[in-house]
């Protein structure tokens, strides 16, 4: 069977869930994949298969999509080998690991944290902001104080590998492209949709820089009547176009998730004059389980998980 770059490239097994996934026909991301029933999880980037596996395990236990998103993203946040999220994330120009995260549930509630330090799981803090305060976002020292008051512990998130990369960067100031946010969307057995995003942001960014990840409507937007979208890449350009919100609204207007992602990338493309060191990618899902993904440049992959499969799909892109 011929597998094109538009189709699935890998099939894995759900780790830790006790389920051995069968390889089945690949998903064609251009015509979409529709599910009549059952839970589904999608997330940005191939290394996050393990996060999808955990999220699906949570859904199969009967928990809701918000629980699944949080527990799935926690896996990536705690991975010291992931240099763009949580523990092990590359620091800013001052050697500080600062994190951004956001979360939305099927009721339209949202919470986020920005520029938070020393807390390993910002996705969980973002959820508490949503559930325990009247606010949507907390930032910096205030976000950290809130986390500590709610039982989170202060931890050093700078690993030796990340520290060495920062020291090497300080010597020669060579730009390192590293902005691979995890964005996850999940639909549970009750057909309720939630989403979440977590990142350590651009490697060696200016101290104080905040990207799109904690901005509702930029890196994340979910509407339980329509679907949801997440972004990854250079957040400055996502913020300028509110890409995830735009995608969901285009879906509301009748576009498929795939066509809506393409629309958002084309709008971004038209606004740019210099494409050097810039890439943005979007991932979207409708309430029927149809998935779409599109990127400005090549290389973007996403994870697609149901109760019977856990696989990586390669996205199409604009700038061939």
Short names for language-model regions:
Residues 2-4, 10-13, 18, 29-320:
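Alpha/propeptide regions of enzymes that mature by internal proteolysis
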Residues 22-26:
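C-terminal segment of classical bacterial N-terminal signal peptides
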